[in-house]
Amino acid sequence: TGNKVTGASFINTKKETLIVHAALTIDGTDLGDAFAAAGAKYDIGMEDSSYSKEAMAPGNYLIIQDLTWAAILKDFGKGADKTIARPANYDSTLYFCCCTDAPCKEGKPYNVNAAKMLEYGRIPGDKFMINWPAHGNDFIGNFIDINPIDREKALEGARQKTLGFIYFIQTTLGMKQYGLANEFPSNHKLALMPY
């Protein structure tokens, strides 16, 4: 009603309807799609200091955490070459300074070597989750308040950023024995969705 969401209607595959009335509604969708679909007023990002009156709050309330499309690499052992195909629009400079072993023409490299960078995401079975924020596979963008076609283009950009980082690890960092593990039932072998 107006600028307040007082519940929701759900329709299942049998065309049965369930109506839920609520005093308080929390949008639990990944990207706030329920409130947007309802036409309700909502905020995204961190609270602006002008709103919260907190001195330590940021001034830009549209700051949204970067999205990451995680991947799992497996160490296939010395001599293995698991190098993936060069991703479309690959740009190695996006990954410069990700660690001390990487080229770093401007600024300072993140203060770990390539092995420690992979160790950050180590999981059992000689596998490594690739989720590296420092010049790695974090993807900056607003995936909220955009139409489905533009959102899918942006999400494809995030997938390509992760594939590019994997390619960089394998080629520029010389770690070609680390290949995509067969962990996810997806064509690209990346996680089913970003976080």
Feature roles, as predicted:
Residues 2-7, 11-195:
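Flavin (FAD/FMN)-binding glycine-rich loop and adjacent Rossmann-like elements that form
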